[in-house]
Amino acid sequence: SIDKINELKYTTSMANCRGCTNNCRLTINKFSGGRQYVSGNRCERGIGKEKNKDHIPNLYEYKYKRIFSYTPLTADKASRGKVGIPRVLNMFENYPFWYTFFTELKYEVVLSPTSTRKIYELGIESIPSESECYPAKLAHGHVTWLIRNGVKFIFYPCIPYERNEFPDAVNHYNCPIVTSYAENIKNNVDELNDPSITFRNPFLAFTSEEILANRLVEDCLLYTSPSPRDRSVS
């Protein structure tokens, strides 16, 4: 009624929402009778309808585990022995392929551990330049870790081109560091000069399965028969 409208009283105050880092400036109108109206908010958190959720999935963690959580063959099933793969650079996208490839060829895939300061310090003496990015510097430690853990065959390919995931993409070329950093490793990690250690870093591209398969045989797997090689690539 008109009387109730005339009797309506309200107070206005200002506050900052703490629901997220936006810190929205809120205008809070409190009316007689206990009701209130909030404006200035950009989402429901500012008016108390939605609370911060503590069960939102960590997609970075999910991707990391999804890419690297493969179980290698046991020694009795790995008839070709071990192959070491450093957990660096392009392996954060391509490891599932290489794991499957070498597992099909009956290798036990040995993956270097998660990057830590200790891993970094393992390879610090072989880093040739301070201007390299930190992920590239870590590669020295990962390769050194594989060597010091007795892995005699290390595979770290140079990948100029990735698989084209979008038909209308202008290009799918890796940065120069990812493209050729294994060459840097080969020429600066002195322990790779040990004749008992085989370090393979062929230049490969994911643009053609047929060319990729042929290059793998030509560059680093000459002793494998074509049939298991073709199957592992496909």
Enumerate the predicted regions with their spans:
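Flexible inter-domain linker/hinge segments
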Residues: 1-80, 229
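Short acidic, glycine/serine/threonine-rich loops at helix termini
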Residues: 28-31, 39-40, 95-97, 121-125, ...
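Conserved small/polar residues in nucleotide/adenosyl-binding loops
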Residues: 223-230
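Phosphate/diphosphate-binding loops
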Residues: 1-30, 138-149, 153-167, 186-187
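Glycine-rich, acidic loop regions that bind phosphate or pyrophosphate groups
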Residues: 164-219
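Short helix-loop-beta junction
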Residues: 99-109
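Short connector loops at secondary-structure junctions
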Residues: 107-131, 202-207
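Cofactor-cradling patches in redox/metallo enzymes
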Residues: 87-90, 120-174, 178
